[in-house]
Amino acid sequence: MSDRIRVRYAPSPTGYLHIGNARTALFNYLYAKHYNGDFVIRIEDTDKKRNLEDGETSQFDNLKWLGLDWDESVDKDNGYGPYRQSERQHIYQPLIDQLLAEDKAYKCYMTEEELEAEREAQIARGEMPRYGGQHAHLTEEQRQQFEAEGRQPSIRFRVPQNQTYSFDDMVKGNISFDSNGIGDWVIVKKDGIPTYNFAVAIDDHYMEISDVIRGDDHISNTPKQIMIYEAFGWEPPRFGHMSLIVNEERKKLSKRDGQILQFIEQYRDLGYLPEALFNFIALLGWSPEGEEEIFSKEEFIKIFDEKRLSKSPAFFDKQKLAWVNNQYMKQKDTETVFQLALPHLIKANLIPEVPSEEDLSWGRKLIALYQKEMSYAGEIVPLSEMFFKEMPALGEEEQQVINGEQVPELMTHLFSKLEALEPFEAAEIKKTIKEVQKETGIKGKQLFMPIRVAVTGQMHGPELPNTIEVLGKEKVLNRLKQYK
């Protein structure tokens, strides 16, 4: 193994980029970049039945969107390819043959039904299910008999007995497994395709992967992979297993959990910013020194320290994600946020599909009103409902404000001045409200609150003159006149 840091993210194209997998990719990326190493993407595509047609493309597209630029993969061969497992059979086969020749592996002809019956019997006896080794020492005659029956063999690794497999995990510390608790396991399925634990160990060795950083659901795979390294006399990589991501009930994040959006694609569609999602995911199971929580990608690369990866489960806090994205939204120029929000405004029929310059100008003003409040671009639709829907029935507090003694006088003056106002723009509207204040003597909350309630139906909201401009003269006058 070389001294250079080389890590890999190895997705299967059986689904879209999940938050958990994105975190695995991100921590591998930060680790590699912090040490000036290589971030490799390898595609584990041997499960042909489950592979999605656009699964691979989607993985790459979303990784690129997040800012996780890879150094090697199917599109950037650096001499360690092929980068798809399905194209590496020529690498696996000689090694399979070697294990068979050295009696470190053997052919097993047991049927699925026989294996299932064994498993059920073990569970009924209260035992941990494991292969009992029935075909570990077949004679040549027995093998020929099974093949004459048309049985297709799998190939099993012969697990050494009474051996302890230990590794120093960069997150969890020392972890040990007793080989007697692990049955002889399948390295090649009946269809000739190598299994995950066999192929991944071979690939990591030949690609000179120095560190394997992944979720702690892979801990139980590690001894099997170490067995393969030892069988060939290779040095294993360093391992690091990150803690689980949990939901509000502190249960493992499940793809069936409808309370949390779990795919990067969904956040893109809602109008989240990639740098905000990067920032949020980087804090799922890792923490910097100090209290600061907003960092650029470059800052994360500089400060990343694998020793600060947490052993405790990482809580997926939806409110925290909204807050982080809002911090980035506030820093963006209005045009960037408007372009992110425009598809949402069009989809909600709030702006025509082919907008005029006037429509676009109005949309930019709407975004300027709400940019500081927006948690994501798509939120502009629910935030700005008052611009498109009929006035809601007033609540008790709003009703109290609008029933104030001075309200009819205030509304009469304001209606008259706004009706004559040209251009109907925020700066002029602000002046007009000041004139009404002077003429009526009504000021402070008694002035602003009734106007806000009358035109928006709400007690709070963005800058009042800007809100009135965006609502437009006709709508504002219609809403004011009922309180004159």
Curated annotation (Swiss-Prot):
Cellular compartments per GO CC: cytosol
Gene Ontology BP, a term: glutamyl-tRNA aminoacylation
Positions of short motif 'KMSKS' region: 252-256
Enzyme Commission numbers on file: 6.1.1.17
Keywords annotated in UniProt: Aminoacyl-tRNA synthetase, ATP-binding, Cytoplasm, Ligase, Nucleotide-binding, Protein biosynthesis
Catalytic reaction(s) noted: tRNA(Glu) + L-glutamate + ATP = L-glutamyl-tRNA(Glu) + AMP + diphosphate
MF terms (GO), sorted A to Z: ATP binding; glutamate-tRNA ligase activity; tRNA binding; zinc ion binding
Motif 'HIGH' region in this chain: 11-21
Pfam families attached to this UniProt entry: Anticodon_2, tRNA-synt_1c
Subcellular localization, as worded in the UniProt entry: Cytoplasm
InterPro entries documented for this protein: aa-tRNA-synth_I_cd-bd, aa-tRNA-synth_I_codon-bd_sub2, aa-tRNA-synth_I_CS, aa_tRNA-synth_I_cd-bd_sf, Glu-tRNA-ligase_bac/mito, Glu/Gln-tRNA-synth, Glu/Gln-tRNA-synth_Ib_cat-dom, GluQ/Sye
Role played: Catalyzes the attachment of glutamate to tRNA(Glu) in a two-step reaction: glutamate is first activated by ATP to form Glu-AMP and then transferred to the acceptor end of tRNA(Glu).
Complex formation: Monomer.
Database matches in HAMAP family: Glu_tRNA_synth_type1
Family from the record: Belongs to the class-I aminoacyl-tRNA synthetase family. Glutamate--tRNA ligase type 1 subfamily.
Name the UniProt record assigns to this protein: Glutamate--tRNA ligase
Species in which this protein is naturally found: Staphylococcus aureus (strain MRSA252)
